[in-house]
């Protein structure tokens, strides 16, 4: 990945609220299935904005910090996804998205961010990201002091 896209907590909340507004009315949904781990925080934000209390997870491992590797399903929610929103932070190459589509063919699959290769696999997303860009999510970063360039 040649570029980095830094996401702040404020940006994430703004994007999640925009996505939530597109998912109204909230009564049409039985619940939310958050893809662990990237979809956990966006899932909580959607649950809050939509007033949804039924939140489950599907646990799929495909990244080891910044290296993509083989998919491994650790836990899945019951059913075919009918009436559920499945949320992840990002659709990248589409590997996880294909697995999600197979597991929950009737779910409404959404992400906050989408790269070109995975975009056709989601029902909705908020932000376009170039394929060669790495996203730094706020839960993966800490706030640190940065000294002035002048050194004074």
Curated annotation (Swiss-Prot):
Stored InterPro entries: PRibTrfase_dom, PRTase-like, Xanthine_Guanine_PRibTrfase
Residues holding GMP: 69, 92-96, 134-135
Catalytic activity: GMP + diphosphate = guanine + 5-phospho-alpha-D-ribose 1-diphosphate; XMP + diphosphate = xanthine + 5-phospho-alpha-D-ribose 1-diphosphate; IMP + diphosphate = hypoxanthine + 5-phospho-alpha-D-ribose 1-diphosphate
Keyword Cell membrane among record annotations: yes
Binding, xanthine: 92, 135
Keyword annotations from UniProtKB, A to Z: Cell inner membrane, Cell membrane, Glycosyltransferase, Magnesium, Membrane, Metal-binding, Purine salvage, Transferase
Top class in the EC scheme: transferase
Record EC number: 2.4.2.-, 2.4.2.22
Keyword Cell inner membrane tagged: yes
Entry cofactors: Mg(2+)
GO molecular function: guanine phosphoribosyltransferase activity; hypoxanthine phosphoribosyltransferase activity; magnesium ion binding; xanthine phosphoribosyltransferase activity
UniProt xrefs under CDD domains: PRTases_typeI
Pathway as given in its UniProt record: Purine metabolism; GMP biosynthesis via salvage pathway; GMP from guanine: step 1/1; Purine metabolism; XMP biosynthesis via salvage pathway; XMP from xanthine: step 1/1
Cellular location(s): Cell inner membrane
Function: Purine salvage pathway enzyme that catalyzes the transfer of the ribosyl-5-phosphate group from 5-phospho-alpha-D-ribose 1-diphosphate (PRPP) to the N9 position of the 6-oxopurines guanine and xanthine to form the corresponding ribonucleotides GMP (guanosine 5'-monophosphate) and XMP (xanthosine 5'-monophosphate), with the release of PPi. To a lesser extent, also acts on hypoxanthine.
Family: Belongs to the purine/pyrimidine phosphoribosyltransferase family. XGPT subfamily.
The protein's assembly and partners: Homotetramer.
Protein name: Xanthine-guanine phosphoribosyltransferase
